[in-house]
C-alpha cells in the first residue's frame, strides 16, 4: 500500500499535513502551522520518531 504525506494550506491560511494510504487519510496534523516549513518539520518528526513508538492502551 502506497503512503504519501500531503502538505496543504487551509482556508485560514495555515499549513497542515495529512498522511494518505491507499487513497484514505489515515493521519493528519490536528493543528495548523504558520509556515509551510513548520508543517514540513512536523512531517519529518512523525516520519523519524514514530517508527518504534510503543502502542499504549488507554
Describe the function of each predicted region.
Residues 25-35:
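A short, exposed loop/beta-hairpin motif centered on an aromatic-Gly-Thr core
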Residues 50-58:
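Short, mixed-charge low-complexity intrinsically disordered segments
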Residues 33-51:
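A short, charged, amphipathic alpha-helix used as a generic interaction element across diverse proteins
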Residues 8-27:
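Short aromatic-glycine-(Arg/Gly/Cys) micro-motifs in beta-strand/loop hairpins
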Amino acid at each position: 500500500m502506497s503512503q504519501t504525506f500531503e502538505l496543504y494550506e487551509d482556508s485560514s491560511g495555515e499549513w497542515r499535513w495529512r498522511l494518505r494510504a491507499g487513497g484514505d487519510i489515515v493521519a493528519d496534523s490536528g493543528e495548523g502551522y504558520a509556515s509551510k516549513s513548520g508543517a514540513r518539520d512536523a512531517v519529518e518528526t512523525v516520519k523519524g520518531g514514530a517508527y518504534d513508538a510503543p502502542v499504549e492502551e488507554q
